[in-house]
A protein has these predicted regions:
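A cytosolic-side transmembrane-helix exit/cap motif
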Residues: 48-58, 74, 99-109, 122-131, ...
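Alpha-helical transmembrane segments and their membrane-interface boundaries
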Residues: 1-45, 123-124, 135-145, 149, ...
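Pore- and pathway-forming membrane helices of multi-pass small-molecule/ion transporters and channels
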Residues: 27-44, 85-119
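Structural signature of hydrophobic alpha-helical transmembrane segments
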Residues: 19-33, 68-85, 89
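Short, highly charged, low-complexity non-transmembrane loops/tails of multi-pass membrane proteins
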Residues: 147-170
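Membrane-helix interfacial "entry" motifs
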Residues: 3-4, 41-53, 72-76, 115-123
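Transmembrane helix-loop junctions in multipass membrane proteins, especially transporters and channels
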Residues: 23-28, 72-76, 96, 100, ...
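Hydrophobic faces of alpha-helical transmembrane segments in multi-pass integral membrane proteins
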Residues: 6-18, 51, 55-67, 82-91, ...
Length: 170
């Protein structure tokens, strides 16, 4: 079994469970998937990846709520576009900081705030759980790969493994 196959199996099971539980708990299922996607995209692994995901996603939620709030306080023609422009600039500038250097994570948090219609409290919980979902998928995939192939450990992570496996096939 390839690492990608092991990761796919574990991810399918865990995401199915998340989707079911999110509905029961009144959480936003797709937002959890956004958090999970951010985890895999941020380039970090383990708790460093969770930390990077949570910091950037929640900063994005704050930016999204700022845009929504300022647009309500100053209801002028075109003000939503003006506030979006200003806050987008801020999101790009703060990416110079190591804390916020995964700018797509910040944008993910911001646009999910709009998609969740500003329901930030449920959104935040869903995004954070999604970050841990990504963590669980990655480590579960590693566990299954090791168990099936009888390797003591997987030396590489998701992106590297996929590339390595492609080279081995060629």
């Amino acid at each position: 079994m390839s690492f990608l196959c092991a990761l796919g199996i574990v991810t399918a099971v865990l995401c199915g469970i998340w989707s079911y539980l999110a509905g029961i708990a009144g959480l936003i299922g797709w937002a959890g998937f956004a958090g999970c996607t951010t985890y895999f995209a941020c380039g970090k692994h383990g708790m460093s990846g969770v930390k990077k995901t949570v910091i950037t996603n929640l900063t994005g939620v704050l930016c999204g709520m700022t845009i929504i709030t300022l647009s309500k306080i100053y209801p002028l023609f075109g003000n939503l576009g003006i506030w979006c422009g200003i806050i987008t600039f801020v999101m790009c500038i703060i990416a110079k900081s190591e804390w916020f250097d995964f700018c797509p994570g910040t944008f993910m948090g911001c646009f999910t705030t709009f998609a969740a219609d500003g329901n930030w409290s449920v959104l935040v919980v869903s995004l954070v759980i999604g970050a841990f979902l990504g963590f669980a998928c990655e480590y579960g995939g590693n566990w299954l790969y090791q168990a099936v192939t009888e390797k003591k450990r997987c030396n590489t992570y998701v992106g590297e493994n996929v590339l390595q496996e492609k080279k081995e096939i060629e």
